[in-house]
């Protein structure tokens, strides 16, 4: 059964936050009690995105996203093994990147979200468009909607606050037509390097890019008779500077920038943001950027946002939800799924 969406209106915020943190406290023994850094000491991380053992026999899959031929179940799931360089020194610096340093390391929500997205049956609406229930805070079904597919070749993904790791863009580039990573200038060199180091994990599609130097990394394979193997579909993978504090509150019609030049003329646009709301100073700039991009495209095609938040301070989460529901013309829902409800993470679905 797919996930449902719980509607959160202005009048629901206080009750929702209270109930959510009450649930977190009751699950405290089974939930990691830390800030959410995947590894705060290592400069090189080996991260595996793999199906749980309940879904597949471990002996039927291999690393680097390549699967052995065998039974049907082994061909249904991919296994990604990342090597990620992160900068722990810059994380603690007061000088680097204008003191905005959280993007220099991998945070735990990213691999958790990726495994849920790929392997959890309740995430199936993100694989193929289907109907999902809209429920009240009391979990009463109000109506249903067709949820757009994320892992679709017609989808454009714009990630806000990509960070240094490359996990999400590499994984999604096996499925989507366009993926645009954005972050502050100081983060992008490390992100580009991690993309280059893990590009072999994109084995379903061929990457093309105007902002990444990948000409010598991903080449068209040939067979033993020197005949070109059938060309794979392409994914446009780009990296761009985007600072929420300086981003315009409205994008002028006809503007030319990476957010407009590389977006396909059809298909759904997904704005993705994972663990980017962790203090009150980021909330307004982030929401203004989100609204600016969504408003620009709203009359051209479907555009939606998935925002994942690590639930640390209840005051920060409450302020974020209050601003979403009172200061912007957004419709707010939270993904209702057992994996998330018994964790310290929420995934919010935001539309205009």
From Swiss-Prot:
GO CC terms in record: cytosol; protein-containing complex
MF (Gene Ontology): S-adenosylmethionine-dependent methyltransferase activity
InterPro entries membership: Methyltransf_16 (IPR019410), SAM-dependent_MTases_sf (IPR029063)
Class in the EC hierarchy, top level: transferase
Disulfide-bonded cysteines: none
GO annotation terms (biological process): methylation
Keywords: Methyltransferase, S-adenosyl-L-methionine, Transferase
EC number: 2.1.1.-
Annotated residues for binding of S-adenosyl-L-methionine: 107, 161-163, 183, 244, 274
Signal peptide: none
Its biological purpose: S-adenosyl-L-methionine-dependent protein-lysine N-methyltransferase that methylates 60S ribosomal protein L1.
Family of this protein: Belongs to the class I-like SAM-binding methyltransferase superfamily. RKM5 family.
Protein name: Ribosomal lysine N-methyltransferase 5
Species of origin: Candida glabrata (strain ATCC 2001 / BCRC 20586 / JCM 3761 / NBRC 0622 / NRRL Y-65 / CBS 138)
């Amino acid at each position: 059964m797919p996930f449902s969406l719980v509607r959160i209106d202005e009048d629901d915020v206080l009750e929702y936050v209270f109930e959510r943190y009450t649930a977190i406290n009751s699950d405290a023994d089974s939930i990691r009690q830390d800030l959410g850094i995947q590894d705060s000491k290592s400069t090189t991380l080996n991260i595996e995105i793999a199906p749980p053992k309940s879904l597949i026999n471990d002996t039927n899959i291999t690393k680097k996203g390549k699967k052995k031929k065998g039974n049907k179940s082994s061909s249904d799931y991919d296994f990604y093994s990342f090597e990620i360089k992160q900068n722990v020194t810059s994380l603690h610096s007061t000088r680097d990147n204008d003191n905005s340093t959280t993007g220099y390391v991998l945070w735990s929500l990213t691999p958790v979200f990726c495994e849920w997205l790929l392997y959890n049956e309740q995430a199936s609406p993100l694989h193929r468009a289907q109907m999902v229930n809209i429920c009240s805070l009391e979990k009463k079904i109000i109506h249903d909607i067709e949820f757009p597919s994320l892992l679709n070749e017609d989808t454009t993904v714009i990630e806000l606050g990509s960070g240094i790791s490359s996990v999400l863009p590499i994984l999604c580039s096996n499925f989507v037509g366009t993926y645009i990573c954005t972050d502050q200038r100081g983060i992008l060199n490390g992100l580009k390097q991690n993309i280059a180091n893990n590009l072999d994990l994109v084995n379903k599609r061929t990457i093309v890019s105007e902002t990444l130097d990948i000409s010598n990394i991903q080449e068209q394979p040939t067979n033993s008779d020197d005949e070109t193997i059938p060309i794979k579909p392409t994914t446009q993978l780009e990296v761009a500077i985007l600072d929420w504090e300086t981003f315009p509150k409205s994008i002028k019609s006809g503007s030319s920038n990476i957010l407009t030049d590389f977006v396909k003329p059809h298909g759904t646009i997904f704005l993705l943001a994972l663990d980017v709301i962790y203090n009150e100073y980021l909330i307004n700039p982030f929401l203004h950027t989100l609204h600016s991009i969504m408003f620009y495209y709203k009359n051209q095609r479907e555009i939606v946002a998935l925002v994942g938040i690590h639930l640390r301070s209840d005051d920060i989460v409450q302020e974020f939800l209050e601003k979403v529901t009172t200061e912007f013309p957004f419709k707010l829902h939270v993904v209702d799924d057992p994996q998330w409800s018994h964790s310290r993470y929420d995934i919010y679905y935001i539309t205009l």
